[in-house]
Structures are given as structure tokens and as C-alpha cells.
């Protein structure tokens, strides 16, 4: 009985038991109607968010096209070298479509992207999509490792900090988390490399490890994963602490205590489940930020990945690869934020009630 009342209170449902003049069938019909209306609201919200995400990607495509065409330097001269003749350059421009008006180039760019064609490498002639697909898994694995350990530790620290509010432990955790937020990831990367790889020599410094050797690859993930995820430990811990303190003041928590449930069970089974829901949204944004933050880790630790690919191609003025890699990264950021937003709306009854 206590558990069902707590769940009803937590979901903020209207209890139909004991209502004068109401029958069981009327109550059931009302519940079904409420659920159907909630599903329609969820679908409408999803379509709205999906349309907004598509619009963001479209704007990002336009900005990316303009920026890459404003960057100084001639990609044709870079691709063909200093000994290329004028006729060779003109032929190359015609083959790549660079000699066309800008608006036609933009139309072709959008059309090709919609067909899954991100262009060709100006040096090798390889498909940009194939190049990005070879580098992207390295970055995805790095981001997953970073987000995994930072979310786990951040939730634990935030929970302990909220339960021990205003204690010495709470203050120590507060100092640690604020310090983790304040230190830039590239500084953490440099010091981690200096301490653990150069001075102590307990972890490998550069590369992604031997192909096929899982243990060696995991060792090469430790330092960049630590550097990339340290700041997010602080963000997640502070968010979980604030959310836990808010949830601990809710009516269903008071009801659970009134029914005599153990405090540890209340925290682990009821409070924490709702308190970590906002973390889902933060992780969605965090994945996108980590995709861009991976650039520093991949450069410092000489790891293959999408960030290092963009960095190298910018130096080489290889604009098609830069366009394709940045566009894929932007799409991943938008999609991760969309998924996190929808999961958050599904898990939290308070969000669904406000749709």
C-alpha cells in the first residue's frame, strides 16, 4: 500500500478511489483518456523538437559553407602543387565545380549532403564520408569512456553531497567539483601526460594502441578519457546534488518517511531515480561538447579521431574534408541533444505534465 501511494504521488496522478458517485469503469476510462492525451502530446513534442533539430542542422550547413569559402588560400593550388599549369588548374576547378557561381555551389552542396555525399578529398580523391567513417569510431569510443566514468563518479559524489548536506564531506566534494570544472581539459591533458606517461611511466603516452589488442587499446584510453571527462564530473555532481535536494523536499518523500520506509531505501529507490533525470539532458549536451573537446585530447595524445582529422585538414586547407567532418560532428551533437531531451520527457512525469 505504501509503495503504491508513493508511486501515485510521484507520478502526480489523480486517485479515483473513494470519489463519490464515480464507478470503476468511469475511472478506467478517464485513465485511458489521460494516457492517450499524454501520448499525443509526446508525439507532438517530438515532432516539434525534430523540426527544430533539422532547422539547426540546415543553418549549420549554411554557416559552414560560407565560412569555408571565406577562408584565405586556394585549395586548387594546394591540391595540385606549385608546378601546376593554368590549364591544369582550370580543368581541376571545372571537375570539382569550384568555377561555378557560389549559389550553384551551395545548391550542389546541399543536394549532395542530402544524398549522403560529403564530397572528395582534394589530395587523394577519396570519399570524405569514408574518411570520416574511419576516424569517427575512435572519437566515439573516447567520448563514451569519458562520459561513462564521469557520469558514474559525478552521480555518486552528488548523491553523497546531498545526503550529507552542509557537512565536511559536502564541502570537500564541493571544492573538488568546482576545481574540476575550473580546469580546462587541455591543461588536464598536458599534466596527465607529463605525470603519468613521462614521469611515472605507468601509462602509454601516444597513439590508440595496437590493432586487435584490447588491453593495449584500453590502456591508451585511460589518459585521454580522464582528461576529457574530469570537468564533467564537477558539472554532473553539482547538478545531481541540487536535484537531490529538490526531490528530497517533495511530498512523496515525506509520505515514504511517514510510512516508515528506511532512509537508504528512500534515497536509492525513489529520490535518486528522479534526481538523475536532469542529468540525462546534461549528458546529451555533454556528448556534443566532448566531441569538440576531444580535439585537444586527440592532439595532445596523438590519437586518431574526428577532432585531429579536422585540425590536420584545416592546416592542409583540405576544405571538403573539413566541411564533412564538422557537419557530421554537428549532426551528432544535435541528435544526441534530441535523444536526451526525449528521454528526459519520457522519464520525468513533471516534464510530461507541462507539455
Language-model features, listed with the residues they occupy:
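Hydrophobic alpha-helical transmembrane segments of membrane transport/permease proteins
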Residues: 57-107, 200-220
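Membrane-water interface segments at transmembrane-helix boundaries in multipass membrane proteins
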Residues: 125, 174-238
